[in-house]
Amino acid sequence: MTRPINGLSHVKGSTTRPLIHATIPSFIAEVRKRHGHRMAAVFSQTGERWTYDDLMRRADRLAAGLLSLGVYKGDRVGIWSPNRPEWVLTQFATARIGAILVNINPAYQTPELEYALRHAGVSTLITAPQFRESDYLGKLRDLAPELATARPGHLHSKKLPDLRRIVQ
């Protein structure tokens, strides 16, 4: 039986069931080993179909790219994108390197985006250029005009002090 604690939206269940001592990457590696040729994801918008081997190869490439940019274990990586293949890759790539994935609502406008990035301490933001009528890159330029002159990986924004890099 679960019960609310202090009337908040936190619920604590039974603690008698042991935790699974596996990481997401180790679990996926095991699934890949057993079922690498099987379908892992189908993206109806793009028509792409990925097996577990495809998914993990792509996620490993993104993880290597993030590491080469200076993203490490414990860093917060935001993704501001609609549901797309890149979102899935980012989820697995950040888990692979031990970075913390911060999901940014694709409908956010500038004030909500600023709050989310500041509050979560996002140092790297992976973003789509736009979503529907929302110009993501324009909103980022409004929030961080320093983008116009910053060297890649060396953004220093007054409004977004933790953000160092934007990946598109």
Regions found by a protein language model. Give the residues of each.
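Conserved AMP-binding/adenylate-forming core of the ANL superfamily
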Residues: 20, 37-92, 109-114
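Hydrophobic alpha-helical segments typical of transmembrane helices
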Residues: 23, 27-28, 112
